[in-house]
Curated annotation (Swiss-Prot):
Protein name per Swiss-Prot or TrEMBL: Putative DNA-binding protein YwzG
Keyword vocabulary terms for this entry: DNA-binding
Listed Gene3D superfamilies: Winged helix-like DNA-binding domain superfamily/Winged helix DNA-binding domain (1.10.10.10)
CDD domains listed in its UniProt record: HTH_ARSR
Keyword DNA-binding: yes
Family annotation (Pfam families): PadR (PF03551)
InterPro entries reported in the protein's UniProt record: ArsR-like_HTH, Tscrpt_reg_PadR_N, WH-like_DNA-bd_sf, WH_DNA-bd_sf
SUPFAM superfamilies in alphabetical order: Winged helix' DNA-binding domain
GO MF terms, alphabetically ordered: DNA binding
UniProt feature coiled coil, ranges: none
Organism: Bacillus subtilis (strain 168)
Length: 112
């Protein structure tokens, strides 16, 4: 299980990355993150939904309701143009940060 603070700090880029592919509802986002991470990333809905609401307030995502043939309506989220710009910036930042961490950890003998 990953450190909770690492997951929390990565939520924005994870959500925007997935929503850049297609609109998804909250539970679908949780499942997709788990699936793609080999179930290493077990994001709790209590972490995800406040992040979704914040991203929506910031204008990075928008939401809409969709009727279901069976079961209750689902609230889907989609990335906005502003969200795509933020995703591009955060992806560059992540790449720089990740490379820096790898260099530091390798230099100190902590990363293989």
């Amino acid at each position: 299980m990953l450190n909770r603070e690492l997951v929390k700090g990565s939520t924005v880029i994870l959500v925007l990355t997935l929503l850049n592919e297609r609109p998804m509802y909250g539970y679908e986002l949780v499942k997709e993150m788990g699936s793609r991470s080999g179930n290493e990333l077990q994001m709790k809905e209590g972490t995800l939904y406040p992040s979704l609401h914040k991203l929506e307030r910031q204008g990075y995502i928008s939401s809409y309701w969709e009727k279901q043939e069976k079961g209750p309506d689902r609230k889907y989220y989609r990335i906005t143009d502003e969200g795509k710009e933020v995703l591009a910036e955060r992806t560059k930042e992540w790449s720089v940060f990740s490379a820096m961490m790898d260099r530091i950890l390798k230099w100190s003998g902590q990363n293989g």
